[in-house]
Amino acid sequence: VHVDKNKDTIDTHLYGPENPLIKGRGKLATPLKITFLKKENAIELKICGKKYRIREGEYSPWVKVVFKPLPIIKIRGICRFYLKQLNPALELYVTPINIDPEKPALPISHPFIYAVYLAKLIGLYATLGLAEDTWALNEGVIDENAFLKQAYLFFEEREKVFLKALERTPRGLCACVFDTTDRLQHMFFRCLDEKHPANRGREVNKYRDVIKESYQHMDNVVGKVLNRIDDKTLLMVISDHGFAPFRRGVN
């Protein structure tokens, strides 16, 4: 979205989904004010009555946003902002809008209240089916470093959810899907393939160990689980598929 700067501030909007109640009204939007904090190499965001400070190269915490398809109806979501750069021009990335797990507009868990319970227990967390924004990296909207930071923010949330669930499961089955190794192999397997066409003009050596490091993170989770279970508990670590070089596709 192109924005115009007025001295040290920008007044714009954060756009959400299409208005689900009134056809032809376009996308829902909520006001967003951006203030430049030059001495801190940062910006301040003011949105939905709250302020957030972000430094260059950092993500914001989860930001609660409210959209109004009608004056008396509110649709609540959450998102994170990432400050790519301040100069020579502002570049600010925002994740896709996720359903707010504390006040979900649609069922995102079963039972319905479980999503709310988790948010109260560990704080806000990603609710989008594929939370890691792979297309933002594919299309150059964010770089590899920003994608890695995002992936591990979501990884930390998933780990918290799993370990809390494990603590509260004295018997029966406790299962959790960790997406991080999958997402990172999709995006960084090229670094293990010297002939991959996506490597042209892009950094390779710096990210050659990304996949190995993701499995080290998962090994750490396995260690935490082993420390929490007894000899009568069966632990299964299962992969649903593997990876191989993928150089060409048809749109």
Residue ranges of model-derived segments:
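His/Asp/Glu-rich, glycine-adjacent segments
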Residues: 1-201
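Conserved acidic
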Residues: 147-150, 154, 206-210, 214, ...
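Extended hydrophobic/aromatic segments used for targeting, binding, or gating
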Residues: 187-228
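Metal-dependent active-site segment of extracytoplasmic phospho-/sulfohydrolases and closely related
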Residues: 213-251
